[in-house]
């Protein structure tokens, strides 16, 4: 994924107004990599959400991934946001992502996986 400077002009040039999807916010490392401090999603307009985040002047760069409009974009974006939240544990995400309002009875598969792993029996060698 490409890394962009987080400002209104860059967002306008790179993110179409019709997109939904996921985004990663953070700072640039000395090598130009994105050090992720926040993961999020937009179920309606990624362009608008990124501009709202840019206005906070908290992060210097972003990356994004549009959802596939031909699959189930709400589920896809929620699953990706949850995966990134659990894997990266970004410092600026203060709480677990909420499920989209359009999804009923749908929960984070990574929370379920962690719960199953923590309740699995461990043999004396520490192998599951």
Task: Name what the model sees in each region.
Residues 1-37, 41-128:
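Boundary/linker segments flanking structured domains
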């Amino acid at each position: 994924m490409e890394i962009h400077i987080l400002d209104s002009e860059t967002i306008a040039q790179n993110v179409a107004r019709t997109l939904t999807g996921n985004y990663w916010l953070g700072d640039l490392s000395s090598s130009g990599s994105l050090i992720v401090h926040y993961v999020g999603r937009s179920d309606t307009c990624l362009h608008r959400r990124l501009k709202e985040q840019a206005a906070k002047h908290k992060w210097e760069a972003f990356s994004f991934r549009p959802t596939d409009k031909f699959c189930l974009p709400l589920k896809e974006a929620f699953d990706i946001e949850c995966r990134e939240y659990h894997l990266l544990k970004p410092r600026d995400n203060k709480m677990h992502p909420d499920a989209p309002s359009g999804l009923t009875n749908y929960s984070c598969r990574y929370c379920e996986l962690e719960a199953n792993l923590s309740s699995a029996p461990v043999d004396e060698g520490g192998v599951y």
